[in-house]
Every structure is written in C-alpha cells, then in structure tokens.
Amino acid sequence: KTDNVVYKRLAKFFGKLFIISFAMGVVTGIVQEFHFGMNWSEYSRFMGDIFGAPLALEALTAFFLESVFLGVWIFGEGRLSKKLHCLSIWLVAFGSNLSAFWILVANSFMQHPVGYTIANGRAEMTDFLALVTNPYVVGQYAHTVLSGIVTAGVIVVAVSAYRLLSGQNVETFKT
C-alpha cells in the first residue's frame, strides 16, 4: 500500500517465494486427495461421509478464496487501487488460515472422533457442530498457524541474511 520502493521490492521478492510454496502445496494436496482413494480406500469408504465434509469445504471455500485472490494479487498490481491490491493479499492470508482450519477439522476427527455413529457398517455424521468444535481443533490450529508464522519469519530472516552476506541488494534486504 505504501509507495516505499524498498517494501515493494521485498513484497515482489518474497511474493515469488510464496507463489512457489503455494504451487507446491497445490500439487501435494492434489496427490494427497488421490491417496485417500487409492492407498486408504477402506478408511475412505468407512469414514468418507465425515472425513470428506471438511475437506470438501476446504476445497470449495478456502482453496478457491486463496486461488482467486492470489491471482488478483499477482495480476492486479498496477491495475487495481493500492487498497484493493493490498486487500487481495490479506484475503489470501485469510483463505490460507481457513484452509488450515478445515484440514485440521478433518485431522482432529482422526485423532479424536466426535459427532458420529456407526450405521450400516459405516461411520455417519450425527453432529457437524461437534466435528467443527472438536477440542483437538483448537490446539492443532494454534500450533499449525503459529508454527507457520514462525517458519515464514525464519525463512525471511535466513534469505535476507544470505542476501546481505553475499552482497546482493544490500539496501533492500537490510530493511
């Protein structure tokens, strides 16, 4: 949002690293979805109605939110107002956190199953709210999001230190 050229360079540089990371997440996420059907087909058959709901919500809400607004952020620079361009990356961040939430709802169910009953040889969801408010979600979500923030910070510091020590764009990376 600012007109500071150093911040703009940093945003472009680290934005490219984020795009690479996002692309890797998409690729591994798609492979993971295939694993559910191929490697864990019995689990998917037995728990699919419950386990699939949060993963479907992740794909339909969070992933599309991230993807659309990442595209807006990448291709909207210079075409959108600075406020709208800034808002687009904040919506990517929101979508990433929402994505983490839905994935962790599914994972929390695997760790501590709630809100279901066994009927006709399969697990059937009886309480979606119990699934979403599973006590394990809170701890896993806090751990995952805070770990992601710390990891991102370490990467920014490490890359900046490398660039400083190698004498590349010193004025930009000392900020």
Region roles according to the model:
Residues K1-T175:
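Polytopic transmembrane helical bundles with strong interfacial aromatic enrichment
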